[in-house]
Amino acid sequence: MALFYLDSSAVVKLVRDEPESHVLRACLSDEDLVSCDLVLTEVPRAIRRAVAQDPRLALDVLIERAEAVLEAVALLPLDRALLLAAGAFAEPALRALDAIHIAAAIDLSPVDGFVTYDERQAAGARLAGLRTMAPGS
């Protein structure tokens, strides 16, 4: 089995039915998945934003799906060393939460892929030496 690090944009695509979701689910179906504790906040926030923009979406159903998806993803705890590593990246355009995800993936290295649908984060991950993926995009 391969090990893939998922950022929040990838986790959300596993929860919601978005254009890339089917391909992403197929690509990751038998793989080991990992992220960091940051997704415990980012994913529910993204779901709540989506429901606010599209009232046809059912918040309770999506939150339940998110909980099920997150149970299948190993979560790396955020600690001082990880946060300091994220803060030390030289790339000035790298946003704080993106830097935390990249630092977490590096901490787990080697990972077979860093899965993100955020191009700015993907660029930062590549600069840090990670192989990025966005299945279906």
Predicted feature descriptions by range:
Residues 1-39, 51-63, 128-130, 137:
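Short, well-structured N-terminal submotif of metal-dependent ribonuclease cores
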Residues 10-11, 39-40, 82, 101, ...:
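Alpha-helix capping/helix-boundary segments
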Residues 14-15, 46, 124-125:
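Residues that scaffold the ATP/ADP-binding catalytic core of kinase and kinase-like folds
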Residues 64-92, 100-102:
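Acidic catalytic patch
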